[in-house]
């Protein structure tokens, strides 16, 4: 039985700016929900608003979790949470709190590290800091600039990190189809190891992604195009993608994420677990999800490395919860 559900606000401070085509973060608020059971057990869940991605706001999440519907809950299961008429991020925080009550084993998986959008002058030091920290796979955030500058960035990463360093390119929906085709062809000529191109076009443009996949060799990853099993059907039918990035907040919790991953893997997609930078508890939950579903994959779980304060450990390209 649930004794109380407490909603708290916290601020996450980053040690350096996190810059993508969608977000520019130095610090940001997160919402933490604490479920206390009559037995004395406590579960903690976290979420963050991402208006540019999920379409929610911080205040909407607070309203959800402080609502009479949620505050009046006395018994709840992961299946029950799916039926709550609240935002996916709000559901995810509640789902995460239930997971927290029963799971504290340490897990470890391989992860990449993000290289944010920056000027070329700063890029060298940014890459060097990540190499010195032991990371071996790099996710390069980009917007639609010039192809020449994109190639310069790739060359610089290879120069600092090694010629055959695996690089993932993530435009976060910022590219046009024409630019994506032209840029990918030049990248293929460069000899760089481009592991995949993540969500280059807008999330609704599955036909464009299919056309792109037929024009280039570099595999595509779906991220913003797939939040749930309903959208997965379109992803699979498009035959455009080889990879799928799954995030707990997008899916609405660990329980629905597990279901989505099973369906995606059955359809032949390779899974990578990511996060919305929703706080340390959220990253621990994502590490658990990654270890349970794709233990040998290189995931996208560097978020806690950006935090000024964190007890999550990173070493030699691994993240330890």
Per-region residue spans from a language model:
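Active-site lining segments that contact anionic ligands and/or coordinate catalytic metals
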Residues: 30, 241, 268, 296-298
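Short helix/strand-capping turn motifs
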Residues: 294-299, 303-304
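Active-site donor-binding loop signature of nucleotide-sugar glycosyltransferases
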Residues: 47, 199, 301-303
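Conserved beta-strand termini and adjacent loop/short-helix elements that scaffold enzyme active sites
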Residues: 8-10, 114, 223, 274, ...
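A general lysine-centric signal
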Residues: 139-141, 247-250, 300
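N-terminal capping/lid subdomain adjacent to the active-site entrance of alpha/beta enzymes
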Residues: 1-167, 172-174, 178-181, 185-188, ...
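Catalytic core of soluble alpha/beta enzymes
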Residues: 145-284, 288-290, 307-318
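Residues at the N-termini of beta-strands
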Residues: 4, 137, 196, 243, ...
